[in-house]
Amino acid sequence: IAKETTQERVYNDPEIIAAYLTGSLLSAEPMLGGTADIDIVFVYKNLPAKTREFVKLTPDFHLDISRRAKDEFKSPRELRADPWLGYEMYAPVLLYEREKFFDFVQASLRAGFDFEQPPLMLQRCRKLLSHGRGIWMDISELDHPAGPKEIKKYMKSLFHAVNAVAEISGPPIQERRLLLEFSARAEAVQKTGMVAGAYGLLGANNVDAEKIKGWVSDWKSAFGLATAHSN
């Protein structure tokens, strides 16, 4: 599916210079609750206006298409210190290449075997931590009750903070797999108490199992309405 999608897109769009497969399909356990996303990144000569696209294949499988500009890969030094793009380019599966792009960028990224060494690893972790702290500071002095916008920022802050710990032992964790994989990552760095801390920051101490079960039907209804609206 990834190859077919890539062939179709590059045939109709000469701006695409490369494409690669990344994400959970490259992991040992790509499925989550019987569902999976196929994550494809297209690299363009110039960044298009629409940088993200989701395509439903079946109720359980979707294409998650990201678009990046070639200029984002110019500096190997910056790429090694990027907590997201660095890992994304470190070991993906190349699907297409119009120009000589992929091998050069990947070789520069891997040069000297420095990528996974403590100095660069800590640099990436600190970037995530700084980003999370910055978002937290932005919402910590609200002069009005928190609404959906502030809750979204809070969740993003927590997302970056959790990944600041996760990236000590591997690549950052995507949103949909965050709680599923964080326990093993915290254990890998001997910080198992952070798992309970993360759940606590999500409000787990304020709800019980029965209450959550009561929300499921409302979630299903809202999801159905959102899906119908998007179609």
Identify the function of each model-found stretch.
Residues 1, 83-103, 107-110, 114, ...:
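Solvent-exposed, charged interface segments at domain starts and junctions
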Residues 1-17, 22-91:
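Metal-dependent nucleotidyltransferase catalytic core
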Residues 1-3, 100-109, 198, 202, ...:
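Generic hydrophobic, helix-prone segments enriched in Leu/Val/Ile
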Residues 13, 29-31, 40-46, 54, ...:
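Aromatic-residue detector
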Residues 14, 30, 59, 92, ...:
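Proline-rich intrinsically disordered, low-complexity coils
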Residues 63-70, 113-116, 195-197:
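Short secondary-structure transition/capping segments
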Residues 70-141, 145:
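Internal, well-ordered alpha/beta segment that forms a basic, Gly-enriched binding/recognition surface
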Residues 120-231:
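Conserved nucleotidyltransferase catalytic core and NTase-mimicking acidic/glycine-rich helix/loop elements
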